[in-house]
Amino acid sequence: MFLQKILIKLEIKSTVYKMQVIPINTINFLKELKLNNNRDWFNENKQKFQSIKVDVKNFAGEVKDELNLSDDIENLKIFRIYRDLRFSKDKTPYKTNIGMAFHRKKPEFRGGYYIEISAEDSFIAAGFWNPN
């Protein structure tokens, strides 16, 4: 099942934290979705998507646990794959990435962490979105 893995490592205070991995079948699904971004294809591949959701939830949960070793993460949000098409000129129904946000405990802490996984470009972000 895990033919190839993406491994995220965070180095904090000379301690290396190993994170859960994203299986290659998740990346392959996102590649296929980009080529076939329509409801018929998605419905035919709904079982694959359900399996990937479990993998992503496990990954996000382990990332949250690891972040809590050095921070105070209050909650985790995994964003929906369905796009909001109401005001968009681009009518493709699905996102071709998986995004997740890790919110720090409030009101003591502000800011947070964000991970986005896609077949082309994945990234990790930390800090504040639109701070006042």
Question: What feature does the model see in each segment?
Answer:
Residues 53-105:
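Extended cationic-aromatic binding surfaces that line active-site or macromolecule-binding grooves
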Residues 86-132:
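Aromatic- and glycine-enriched beta-alpha-beta binding-site module
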